[in-house]
Amino acid sequence: MLNNRASGVLLHISSLPSKYGIGCFDECAYAFVDFLKEAGQHYWQILPLCPTTVGDSPYQSISTFALNEYFIDLDALCRLGYLKKEEYEDIKWFEYEDEVDYSLLYTNRHRVLYKAFDRFKRNIPNDFNSFCEQNSYWLDDYALFCAVKDYFGGEPFYYWNEDIKYREELAIEEYINICNERILYYKMLQYFAFSQWLGLKKYAFDNGISIIGDMPIYVAGDSADVWANREIFKLDSNLEASD
């Protein structure tokens, strides 16, 4: 890949133009690929695509495997019949058009995406189960983590009830049942995000543009990665990061 001299541009997905609060995998992303090709560029460098939470930094994510649901193209969901235009066009997405308002984005994106979920669960796509199976090594823990986090009002996992905090087997089964629909919702978000991201990557590759990614080398202390793999992290007795 790097044997020949070539140039490119660093532009994170979030910095692409958008009417809906933040840059995403929409027509502007495809137009940027066209721009790079016309400008004689060969590389598009991006930052980590993982979900952001407190601090809104991709270097402090709740998962190093998942994609950020903010990057889902709402227009694409509309074309597929999961959304209606009026369900997301008339929403206030930001205070200033040149700035991302993460508070508004969090509230409004999930409100809109849950409307898509209401339609999705009535007619689940044929390839959804295979997506979940192929990514089960991280997706199951991630979706459960997000769902249980919602159940506890967004509290860090080390403040949850002791049984689920320490991932006791019976507690895992109990919360899978309690949060079943919410788990499916978070899996759906990843299904949409990965489908759109892979489509954009293929378009870039077909047009001679290679994407240089960035590794999310720091995980948040309150993350699915730490919760599901606490034996490989330096934690105190309460499962918080140890000095």
Question: Can you say where each PLM-predicted feature lies in the sequence?
Answer:
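Acidic/aromatic-lined carbohydrate-recognition and catalytic surfaces
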Residues: 2-230
